[in-house]
Amino acid sequence: MDALGRRISKNAKEITFTYEGKKVSAVEGQTLGAALVGAGHLSQRKGRLGGTHGHYCGMGACFECLVTVDGRSGVRACMTPVQQGQSVKHHPYKTAFYADASRHQSDPKESLEVVAVEVLVVGGGPAGLQAALSARKAGASVLLVDERASLGGQYFKQLSSAYSTKDGKAPDKQMQAGRTLIDELAAADIKQWRNTLVWGVFREEHDQFRIGIERDGKALIVEPKAVIIATGATERPYPVPGWTLPGVMTTGGLQTLLRSYRTAPPGPVLVAGNGPLNLQVAAELVEAGVEVAGVVESAKLTSLTALAQTGKAMRHAPSLIGKGLGYMLTLKRAQVPVFDGYAIAAIEGDSAVERVALAPVTAEGELGQPMRHIKVKAVGLGYGFQPQAEISRLLGVEHHYASDTASALKVLSAERFPDGRCNVEGVFIAGEAGGFGGAQLALAQGALSGAAAAKHCGYNVEDTTAHWSSQQRKHQHFQKALWSAFSSPLKPLAGITDDTIVCRCEGITAKEIISGREPCSDVASIKRQTRAGMGRCQGRYCAATVNMLIASDQKTGSQFDLPAPQNPIKPIAIGALAIEKGEWAGHRRVTMPTARVINESTTLPPSIEVDVLVIGAGVAGSATAMSLAKQGVDVAVLDRGLPNGQASGGNAGSLHVQLLSFDFGKKAESGGGPAASTLPLQQASASLWEQLSKELDSDIEFKRNGGIMVAESEEQMRFLERKAALERSLGIDTQMIGRADIEHKLPAISEAIIGGAWCGEEGKINPLLATPALVRAAQQAGARFFTGEAVQCITYANGKWEVTTSSGRRYRAGKVVNAAGAWAGEIGKLAGVSVPVHAAPLQMIVTEAAEPIVDVLLAHADRHLTLKQAANGNVIIGGGWPAGLSIPFGYQRPLLESIEGNLWVAQHVLPALNQLRVLRTWAAININIDGAPILGEVPHRPGFYNAVTSNGFTLGPLVGQITADLITRGKSDWNLAPFSLARFERQGAA
């Protein structure tokens, strides 16, 4: 396509590749995505529900255009150059493994290469380019990294190398301005790394930043003195029925195809949304010869208010308004209709876009009548922008919700000064990474941030503040007037229906999210229960919508209402990070910060009286409440957060019946005796989970396929023989097996494995589903749950316990159960009881969904490892690797060294895992005692019971049953002496 007619021509050779066996023509220098869309192949990735997805964001953030290239799956078509002879296919929802074993190898390495630099600029758009130039001009050494093959970002998009103009100049002033900056960058001795992914951010206690990047398939660490975050924004999702159909893309994604790669989807194309970008893209499509069905604008551009605001904007930037009027004139000449005051109500079609339903926007922001229907083949959606805040959130930058330009939505924006400084010393945020403001404002912020970063590094900076500050103020005034002209009352969720898909990655609908509000009511809990936000995009295109869906007034709260940010920022191959680490004993304990109290709006009486009050709504507390309520006991559960919000919702879901390797022998705490004494309880509780899986109201993904602990030396086999003998003496049927038996169960097992121990009673469960199911069962039996209630005072008088919470409410009960997990020590202290519980955060890692590779619970005889595959195909990797706490907010967060070591063990045991990418890591608080639970009534505190345990998810149901029996019957069928508080007194005496 000759988009600007006579001026642009191809300067690269034409090549061919195949897509699903069909020959496709392309131009060397295009991306696979551009070539596929231009050829009319709009479907790329297959979804969880069976449908297909295609090119959407065009900037590598959404992962909707994934394809399989020459057998390598998970390739982003929009970021991957086309090559002669490639064999390209749809990407399946579950990644298939290579048959070629040689592809399983990972390059051995002792550590990741570390690159030191004074100023690291992340992002090569307007803000990043100007920031890099400003910092370098002041004398600082600068490294600029960008994920794309060419610099310029979304605004200064450059022609790909496949095309050029006849006179050698850029096709238009916008592109030329970007080229000028890029040329200045090249001449300024600024190191620039393109095609470079920032995958992780780690902030150490001494405030050293470690930025994980991937370049040419190799992971590196950059250690800068200052970081300038200039990652820009993504387009805000507009969920309506049909918005996931192939052929629906963001306006920016549509523009990238056109401006950089001279291609577009087959017309007619409809451009819809809110803001001037839509007019620009529609006009550029017209000039390129693409059939444009119309422009849908939710604002009333012809209203007197809009015209007056346009006049104000013109005073600040007449050339920009002139460009906008030029776009309107182009559309008018081409007889392209502009439907102002309308929004898309639905996009219709079976497997591709066929037509679009439009509705007028009412004064209240709803979609009205009558509807209009337009036949189209592709749609560009542009309903505003949202900052890419992953890096800033990981670094601990404070954020707030700010009004999004012209719409009714508030978006998460960074708290920053005009020069980009924020609450984290050495971190600077420039341009739309901190909040939307347009390219000209981003240039000014970039210049100011670059100078401030150089000053932070100790350089004397030429005072250009006055000029750039003036430019900043000028364009802030311009943006305010411009977006006042585009002001629209349209509500963000006006077009959503029950069946509308909200999470594109996992195919989760609005109805599923709304149904999941009970017993959950925050984004993190909904994420755990529904999987919304667990896909490759990590919630970029659904978290804000989920947040609004669970709030009755469609409003957002604070940054803490979103799930805690975690690494990796974007998926990265296991093999790139796997590094062998040494082994250790024990757990790394931390002092936990006070957990945040959620703001639950409840209208409850000032005091509540019950028979039993349970403190803690994790698996142990919920199981206790369920067991008590089923026996007719009036029971209430308190939690400062939401049910399943801490360790119970953050563990890997292993059901352990045999001892882990670090719970036996010289690595074991307290010699291993307490852990061994707990094994019969674990065995019984695993069976109780099996019974509950048949009784609870939903599938908790319980599976009991057994567990294998593998060995790769004769010494490790002898260790397992001793461990298995102990387990058999306790009634656990653990048997030694050879390599042939392991290979029969696990064909992908490493050749290094010579044998192992097999326990058929082990299994797995989905903790994200299991605890909520227990909560519902408890509620159905009459238990009440009160969230947002942090316990502040516990007293005992006249045979009653009184618990006062942060709301000022008083709960009175004859008996209190301390099921507060890692905070059980705090609760005990309030009641005058010393409960020796410590917090030790542990990490978990999850990969992309894959075809079945492991059907058992897998562990290692001399390494920290647990490994299993979830029902949907994700491989979950854990095994007791330590995590830490983020600065300054105290989020539980994996450590880089633990991620590297855990991945090494996993791929060492199952080499095929090297083909998979890590989707996310997270950490949860492990309850560190001595290897055994603390159960039962405290003798000198009548009516105060402990139900506290490590390995809590395995033991949860039985702990609940035992505690309920003690309360209702005054006894348990189990010998609880090994699990009483008295054992610590005996240890002290000894």
Q: Model-predicted segments: where are they?
A:
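Helical element adjacent to the flavin cofactor pocket in flavoenzyme catalytic cores
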Residues: M175-Q192, V198, G324-V338, A757-K815
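N-terminal Rossmann-like FAD-binding beta1-loop-alpha1 element of flavoenzymes
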Residues: E118-L143, V281-V286, V610-V637
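Active-site lid/adjacent beta-loop-alpha segment flanking the redox-cofactor pocket in flavoenzymes
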Residues: I429, A433, G437, K455-E462, ...
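FAD-binding core/adjacent interface of flavoenzyme oxidoreductases
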Residues: G50-G51, G71-L120, K157, A177-P268, ...
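A Rossmann-like FAD-binding core segment of flavoenzymes
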Residues: R179-I213, V286-E390, V803-T804, Y811
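Dinucleotide-binding Rossmann-like beta1-alpha1 core, especially the glycine-rich loop
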Residues: L220, S654-D741, H864
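Glycine-rich FAD pyrophosphate-binding loop
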Residues: K137-Y155, A293-T302, K630-N651
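C-terminal catalytic lobe of FAD-dependent flavoproteins
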Residues: F339-S403, V424, G431, Q479-I550, ...
